[in-house]
C-alpha cells in the first residue's frame, strides 16, 4: 500500500480540550497536504475547518455525545443536527456504555436510531468504547448498528483506558460484514495501522497520521 493510499484511510484527529484555533488550522493544512480523508474535530471548530478546507477534498468529521456517551438522547440528536448545519460531513457518536452495562438494549438502540435519523443521510459512525465492553457486548452492539444501517462502527474515543486492538477490529468486522469499521485510539505507526486494516478496518482515527503514512515514530500524539 502506498502512502497516498494509506492517507485515504485516515481521519486526522484533534479532539483534546486544549486544542486551539491555530492547532485546528494546522490540522486542516496537514490534511490537505497529505491527502487525509478527513479531519476529526470538536464541533465548535467546524466553521473554522470549513473555511480552511474550502476547495479541497478533505471531509469534516465531528463527534457527538463525546467522550462519555451518557448525554440525553435528545441532546445527541440536536447536537448532530447543529453539527451538520454548521458543515460536518460525518458524525462520530458515542454509544451509551452505561445502558449496555445495564442491559438496556432497547434504549441503546433508540439512542443510536435517534442520532441516525438526525443525520438524515450524513454518514454515522458509532463509537463502542470496546475497552469497556465484553466480547458479547461488542457483538450485540455491532448487531444493533448493522440493523439500523449506520455507516461505521468505531472502536474507541481514545479518552479511556484502552484503544483499538486487532482482535476487537476483527470481531467487529466479522459481525457487521459490509459496514465500515473505524479503528481509533493508540494507532500511532505504520505497522499498527496496516495490522488494523488487515483485520478489517476501513478507516483509521489518529492524531499521528503523518507518522503513520511516513513510517516514522510519533511520541507526542495522544490519540
From Swiss-Prot:
Q: For this chain's UniProt record, which GO biological process terms are given?
A: 2-deoxyribose 1-phosphate catabolic process; carbohydrate catabolic process; deoxyribonucleotide catabolic process
HAMAP family, per database record: DeoC_type1
Q: Which GO terms describe its cellular component?
A: cytoplasm
Q: Does the keyword Cytoplasm apply?
A: yes
Task: Give a yes or no for keyword Cytoplasm in this entry.
Answer: yes
Cellular compartments annotated: Cytoplasm
- Any idea which UniProt keywords this protein has? Cytoplasm, Lyase, Schiff base
This protein's pathway reads: Carbohydrate degradation; 2-deoxy-D-ribose 1-phosphate degradation; D-glyceraldehyde 3-phosphate and acetaldehyde from 2-deoxy-alpha-D-ribose 1-phosphate: step 2/2
Name where it mostly resides.
cytoplasm
Q: Which CDD domains match?
A: DeoC (cd00959)
Q: Which SMART domains match?
A: DeoC
Functionally, this protein is described as follows:
Catalyzes a reversible aldol reaction between acetaldehyde and D-glyceraldehyde 3-phosphate to generate 2-deoxy-D-ribose 5-phosphate.
Entry GO MF terms: deoxyribose-phosphate aldolase activity
Name assigned to this protein: Deoxyribose-phosphate aldolase
Looking at its record, which EC class is this enzyme? Answer: lyase
Q: Which reaction does it catalyse?
A: 2-deoxy-D-ribose 5-phosphate = D-glyceraldehyde 3-phosphate + acetaldehyde
Recorded source organism is Haemophilus influenzae (strain ATCC 51907 / DSM 11121 / KW20 / Rd)
| Residues at the active site | 92 (proton donor/acceptor), 154 (schiff-base intermediate with acetaldehyde), 182 (proton donor/acceptor)
Q: Give the UniProt family note.
A: Belongs to the DeoC/FbaB aldolase family. DeoC type 1 subfamily.
Family annotation (Pfam families): DeoC (PF01791)
Give EC number(s), comma-separated: 4.1.2.4
Amino acid at each position: 500500500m502506498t502512502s497516498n493510499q494509506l492517507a485515504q484511510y485516515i481521519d486526522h484527529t484533534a479532539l483534546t480540550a486544549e486544542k486551539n484555533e491555530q492547532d485546528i488550522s494546522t490540522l486542516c493544512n496537514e490534511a490537505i497536504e497529505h491527502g487525509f480523508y478527513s479531519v476529526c474535530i470538536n464541533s465548535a471548530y467546524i466553521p473554522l475547518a470549513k473555511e480552511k478546507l474550502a476547495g479541497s477534498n478533505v471531509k469534516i468529521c465531528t463527534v457527538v455525545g463525546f467522550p462519555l456517551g451518557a448525554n440525553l438522547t435528545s441532546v445527541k440528536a440536536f447536537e448532530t443536527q447543529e453539527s451538520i448545519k454548521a458543515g460536518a460531513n460525518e458524525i462520530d457518536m458515542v454509544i451509551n456504555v452505561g445502558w449496555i452495562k445495564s442491559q438496556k438494549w432497547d434504549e441503546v438502540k433508540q439512542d443510536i436510531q435517534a442520532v441516525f435519523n438526525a443525520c438524515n443521510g450524513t454518514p454515522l459512525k458509532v463509537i463502542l468504547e470496546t475497552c469497556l465492553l465484553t466480547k458479547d457486548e461488542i457483538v450485540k452492539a455491532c448487531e444493533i448498528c448493522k440493523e439500523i444501517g449506520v455507516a461505521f462502527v468505531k472502536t474507541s474515543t481514545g479518552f479511556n483506558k484502552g484503544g483499538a486492538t486487532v482482535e476487537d477490529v476483527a470481531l467487529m468486522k466479522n459481525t457487521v460484514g459490509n459496514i465500515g469499521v473505524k479503528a481509533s485510539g493508540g494507532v500511532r505507526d505504520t505497522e499498527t495501522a496496516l495490522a488494523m486494516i488487515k483485520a478489517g478496518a476501513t478507516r483509521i482515527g489518529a492524531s499521528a497520521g503523518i507518522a503513520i503514512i511516513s513510517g516514522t515514530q510519533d511520541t507526542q500524539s495522544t490519540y
